[in-house]
Design a protein with these regions (language model features):
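Loop-to-transmembrane helix entry/capping segments in MFS-fold secondary transporters
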Residues: 36-37, 124-134
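Structural signature of the two symmetry-related core transmembrane helices
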Residues: 70-85
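Multi-pass alpha-helical transporter architecture, strongest
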Residues: 87-88, 164-192
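A membrane-interface helix-boundary motif in multi-pass transporters
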Residues: 151-168
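Intracellular juxtamembrane helix-capping segments at the cytosolic ends
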Residues: 109-122
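Extracytoplasmic gate region of multi-pass secondary transporters
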Residues: 2-47, 51-54
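Hydrophobic core of transmembrane alpha-helices in multi-pass small-molecule transporters
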Residues: 94-109
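Helix-to-loop junctions at the C-terminal end of transmembrane segments
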Residues: 54-67, 153-154
Length: 192
């Protein structure tokens, strides 16, 4: 059912967030030799950009209410590309920090549409059960990500940790599009 797709979306997208929150400071220090203060400022900028993106994303969600899955997919694709660029090592520390903070903006813009996507996937009368199930994907993603990507960090694969996060985010894009497709099919069946 579509609820499991929603769970998978939250699981995968949160794995990427956990990488940023848990490892980005260490990655920036190891790859780009930036100071601890600059690296933590980048994490703060990421969070503030995500909050600003959420604000902007509210306008985007109201402008494209029928295409929430596509808005989410577009924002997450952009964020994945930015995260992969940051992990590539092609740029100096300052530019890498700006790119990582911009990733937060892209993810934030998709946030309100993400919530609308979940709302559309929820059958009538099942809101509490669905939201409880779906949002538990956040906890599972946060718990799983350090186990997987901590191994990368331990081996010194700092850039690959971010590139791996970008790949996981692209998987969440595919799942978001699957949620939209299944929600539409579920709606058509209910209308018959």
């Amino acid at each position: 059912p579509v609820v499991w797709w929603c769970f998978a979306f939250f699981f995968l997208s949160t794995m990427t967030l956990a990488i940023v929150q848990t490892f980005s400071v260490s990655i920036l220090q190891a790859m780009h030799h930036v100071s601890f203060e600059a690296a933590t400022l980048t994490l703060t900028a990421y969070m503030l950009c995500a909050a600003a993106g959420m604000f902007l994303g509210g306008f985007v969600a109201s402008r494209f209410p029928l295409r929430s899955d596509r808005v989410v997919a577009s924002c997450m694709t952009l964020a994945a590309l930015l995260m992969a660029l940051c992990g590539s090592g092609w740029f100096n520390g300052t530019f890498a920090m700006v790119i990582l903070a911009s990733t937060g903006l892209a993810i934030g813009v998709g946030g309100p549409s993400r919530d609308m996507m979940i709302k559309k996937a929820t059958p009538k009368g099942a809101t509490g059960r669905v939201y409880g199930m779906v949002y538990s994907g956040l906890d599972v993603g946060f718990a799983t990500s350090p186990l997987v990507f901590g191994v990368f960090m331990d081996r010194g694969w700092y850039g690959l940790t971010l590139v791996g996060g970008a790949c996981v985010m692209l998987l969440s894009v595919m799942v978001a599009l699957g949620v939209g497709k299944r929600s539409q099919a579920q709606k058509l069946v209910a209308e018959r």
